[in-house]
Amino acid sequence: MKHLPILIACLPMFTWANEQPISIQNEFNRFQQQTKKQNEQFQQVQQQRWFEQHQYQVEQQENDQADLSQVCLPYSEIQFVGFHLIDPLPFAPKKNECLNEDRLNQLSQALTAAYLALGYIYNPFQFEDDHSGKLTMRVTEGRISQLSSNSHRLNFSMLLPNSLGKPLNIKDLDQALDQANKMPGSKVSVDVLPAKNGEIELAFVNEEKSRLTGYLGLDNFASKRSGRWQAKGGLNIDNPLGLSDSLYLNVSHSLKSYHHNFNRSLSFFHTIPYGYWTLSSFGSFSAFKSNVPLQHHSVEQKGHTWQAALRGDYTFRRDSNSISNLYAQLERIKSKSYFQDSLILLQSPTLTTVQIGVNHLQLFSYGSLITDFSYERGLRWWNATLNQGQDQPEGQFNRWRAELQFNAFYPIKSQTFHQSSRLIGQYSRNYLPAIKQEELLGRYAVRGINDFSQSAEKNIVLRNNFGWLYQYKQWQIEPYLGMDIGMQKATSPDADSQKAFGYAVGLKTTHPAWYMQLEWATGRLFQRNQIVQERSINANWYVMF
């Protein structure tokens, strides 16, 4: 096979399938683009669970003070006792100021607001009169004395580490609930129970489902050569290590053939909470095999990819309507691509990368917004592919990526309309391996063209859906219209930019036990010398258990 590079050079650049010109490298690129999306999908599932469990919190209105007495009380000043978490002096009445019920109520509200601004929610006040002409305002700052639960899945040393004896902070409590509710089979709430001497018991209640939940389904997202249809399944395990952790297992396989043309994948995602920290590990194996028809015979191409990652997230800011995270990730990818059993080096990178980023989730009264910005650097560690020279894929690279996801719900009379938008942008001056390029076409980008893969280092895609939500008992039905636009340009100085446009009509049906989506889409790719157009019908169905 030493003459294989010459053989490949002599092959036609395009082979015809379903009257559509498909590049010889198309299946390699398509496979690697699908592989890299698996970790991103797990992260999006976690974010979606957060939105499902939270509603926008309206700011509290001030109490009506019309009935409070304006008569001055016989006190010359106020002394504060028991204040350690805030400084009460900036709120103290001025010397010789009239102290009446109205003024004391204003003082109580101001001090309560100061506590709440820092997240401290249980700090009862008491006024004491020692007949000295001074009014004592005593606060009992609530501290956690006991943690209890009806569930063995809740490990408080992981959810609320080192919390006993410390002041109760709503941010710590919300963080613990978010971490606990990442377990798919758990729905955790908490009761705050005052005890003696200002102590507080936190009683956690878990409406448990089975520790094992999951889904089984079918879709036609696989490539045309593997027969489109693939079976998929997932298993979610609550608390497998006793650390209030979560384990997700996913598998998929094309239905048409087990030995000839196929796509298959296996992946896991594991998260361990520790207060404001989350440690995640991810691993996947994906493989494909495809026979490419030529004019007089066919050739075989195949490939597989191993992927593993460790990630740490830290929540550095949160309130009732938002949460902000910093994260860092170390990733290892080893990909092999073969043409007629010979290794294609340019399509077989071994990569070690480190990624840092910031993520923000925001709730509004009418919807939500997710923003994510990240930087990724390719390293030389562990025999990673080295830079081969000019115009060759580089193992050491810099990659910037941004993503915004916006959802809004508009009530118009008795109807509800749903808008969802997703903007993805990537930039790199390096020649990136295919698995690190961003896709312009397909299920995660401009819809409609499923059998023609186009990816590049510089890329921006905007996806939009606008639908009508109809609720009937436990059913939610959403017919929708979609429109996508995108543009990309490779790093090569003589590369032309490419643009794509797509539109879609679809129907989503959601039930607590199952989900179904059917979508018809048309996509157009605008290249320098031609316009590629394709229509597709995508179906996705799964049942949950």
Enumerate the language-model features and the residues they cover:
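Transmembrane beta-barrel wall of Gram-negative outer-membrane proteins
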Residues: 258-360
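Outer-membrane beta-barrel "beta-signal"
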Residues: 235, 507-516, 533-545
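Transmembrane beta-barrel strands of outer-membrane/channel proteins
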Residues: 192, 216-220, 247-253, 281-287, ...
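Periplasmic polypeptide-binding modules associated with outer-membrane biogenesis and secretion
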Residues: 18-222, 252-264, 423
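Residues that define the transmembrane beta-barrel architecture of outer-membrane proteins
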Residues: 198, 227-231, 262-266, 304-308, ...
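Repeated loop/turn-to-beta-strand initiation elements of outer-membrane beta-barrel proteins
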Residues: 188, 212-214, 241-247, 275-281, ...
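C-terminal outer-membrane beta-barrel translocator/porin domains of Gram-negative envelope proteins
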Residues: 338, 343-483, 489-491, 529-531, ...
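Residue-level signature of outer-membrane beta-barrel architecture
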Residues: 237-239, 272, 314-316, 360-362, ...
